[in-house]
Amino acid sequence: MHGRQFETWSCQPPGALSETALQAWLQAMPAGVLRLKGVVQTGAGQWSELQFAGRSGRLRAASAPAPAQQQVPAIVAIGLAGQLPVAALQALVAGAAGVRVAGRPA
């Protein structure tokens, strides 16, 4: 039943994301995102945990995954069905990675 009420979006960033960009991102989360979490690489050998719920978010240092875990960076967002701003989330991740999205400055 919940599957019809909610929609999810996820991505696996291909490289390190800017901590500064992620902090700004958490302060200006697009409307429609109810919950977001993930573990991402923010520098060479540096990992961060990303959390957003309600109207607040945080970024904190995380332990690097053990090689046996083969963990990849990932972000997951949840919103109400039909209201999750997928294009905005994709643009935010691309901007944090320093990638230019067509029609938008990086």
Describe the function of each predicted region.
Residues M1-P73, A81-A106:
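C-terminal accessory "lid"/substrate-recognition subdomains
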